[in-house]
């Protein structure tokens, strides 16, 4: 069978080496004669797995000792409400920086929970010469008191990524669901980082939360116990039964990432993958990117065909060539190629080759 390259925005492809290992030990994990899906989450074998997973993630991201690492339910949307309920209390206010669909959704969820009067938002994206460009505000000039500032550094729908740090007098909370582990960051610049697993970590159903000690002292609102960060810390992410198979696969992805050189080497590869695809888009008049170069996402590359009537043909022929899940989000249309960590350079080269051939044939 010819190679299939999966460009889905999420759930996304997992490293083949991880999938093959999971397949091999599915019915007999760790020599126990049963699957990792079947053992108690409180068994010494599974506890050892969770401890290694946390240690590997801490090493990969250089997480300081004053941060807790939590493995939780709910994905990114679950964290939209968890952040509000854990930190705003009865009188807290928060600022949301909106650079695309997911940061907008987070702000709307916050407004629903505590009212618009307690949530401020700033739109970061404007169209300049038909290109979407991000302008970061000077937060030091805002004469208000916020519990936190929330933003999403990579917007999967819009193909926008913010590479600059957010300089804020208030704790910064980041939704890194789609670019965690794709490039080096300074974790100490954040009060909290959260990420749904289904893009760069593992399958859906799991979310990672990295929270600084002092954030847990902020007043909270009544909420579901399974989304309470303090309870999660006190119970080592096992207040209730966790998504064990997703946790196991996340542990395997972390181990794989360490084996291939860690985040430093992965960032180099991601830069090269994105460079090759954007170079193709820019060279050919057949395709167009709607994002300014300094804000183009490395993870989710959005583009349009100049003749949109060819969209269906492009997708059908790409699928036949083993290049799947290239259709853009329904809200924006066009195409989207998601180049998460597991996507090999060969997949990008195959896509670029197809795009050049398709353009030549249909120009």
Swiss-Prot record:
The keyword Amino-acid biosynthesis applies. It is found in: Cytoplasm. Pathway: Amino-acid biosynthesis; L-serine biosynthesis; L-serine from 3-phospho-D-glycerate: step 2/3; Cofactor biosynthesis; pyridoxine 5'-phosphate biosynthesis; pyridoxine 5'-phosphate from D-erythrose 4-phosphate: step 3/5. Belongs to the class-V pyridoxal-phosphate-dependent aminotransferase family. SerC subfamily. GO terms for cellular component: cytoplasm. It comes from Shewanella pealeana (strain ATCC 700345 / ANG-SQ1). GO terms for molecular function: O-phospho-L-serine:2-oxoglutarate aminotransferase activity; pyridoxal phosphate binding. This is Phosphoserine aminotransferase. It catalyses: O-phospho-L-serine + 2-oxoglutarate = 3-phosphooxypyruvate + L-glutamate; 4-(phosphooxy)-L-threonine + 2-oxoglutarate = (R)-3-hydroxy-2-oxo-4-phosphooxybutanoate + L-glutamate. Gene3D superfamilies: Aspartate Aminotransferase, domain 1, Type I PLP-dependent aspartate aminotransferase-like (Major domain). The gene is serC. Transmembrane segments: none annotated. Its EC number is 2.6.1.52.
């Amino acid at each position: 069978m010819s190679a299939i390259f999966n460009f889905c925005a999420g759930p996304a492809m997992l490293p083949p080496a991880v999938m093959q290992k999971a397949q091999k030990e599915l019915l007999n994990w760790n020599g126990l004669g049963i699957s990792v899906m079947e053992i108690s989450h409180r068994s010494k074998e599974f506890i050892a797995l969770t401890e290694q997973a946390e240690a590997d993630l801490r090493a990969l991201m250089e997480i300081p000792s004053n941060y807790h690492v939590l493995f939780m339910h709910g994905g990114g949307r679950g964290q939209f409400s968890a952040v509000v309920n854990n930190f705003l209390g009865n009188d807290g206010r928060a600022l949301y920086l909106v650079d695309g669909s997911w940061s907008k959704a987070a702000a709307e969820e916050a407004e629903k929970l505590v009212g618009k009067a307690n949530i401020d938002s700033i739109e970061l994206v404007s169209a300049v010469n038909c290109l979407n460009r991000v302008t970061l505000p000077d937060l030091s000039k805002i004469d208000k008191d916020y519990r936190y500032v929330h933003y999403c550094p990579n917007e999967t729908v819009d193909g926008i990524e913010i590479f600059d740090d957010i300089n804020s007098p208030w704790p910064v909370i980041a939704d890194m669901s789609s670019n965690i582990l794709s490039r080096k960051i300074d974790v100490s610049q954040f009060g909290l980082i959260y990420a749904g697993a289904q893009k760069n970590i593992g399958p859906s159903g799991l979310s990672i939360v990295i929270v600084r000690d002092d954030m847990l002292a902020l007043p909270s609102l009544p909420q579901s116990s399974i989304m309470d960060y303090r309870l999660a810390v006190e119970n080592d992410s096992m207040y209730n039964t966790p998504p064990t198979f997703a946790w196991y696969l996340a542990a395997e992805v972390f181990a794989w990432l360490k084996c291939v050189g860690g985040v430093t080497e992965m960032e180099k590869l991601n830069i090269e993958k994105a460079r090759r695809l954007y170079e193709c888009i820019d060279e050919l008049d057949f395709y167009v990117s709607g994002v300014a170069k300094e804000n183009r996402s490395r993870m989710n590359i959005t583009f349009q065909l100049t003749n949109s009537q060819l969209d269906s043909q492009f997708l059908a022929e790409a699928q036949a060539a083993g290049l799947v899940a290239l259709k853009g989000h329904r809200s924006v249309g066009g195409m989207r190629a998601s180049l998460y960590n597991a996507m090999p350079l060969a997949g990008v080269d195959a896509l670029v080759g197809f795009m050049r051939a398709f353009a030549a044939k249909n120009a």
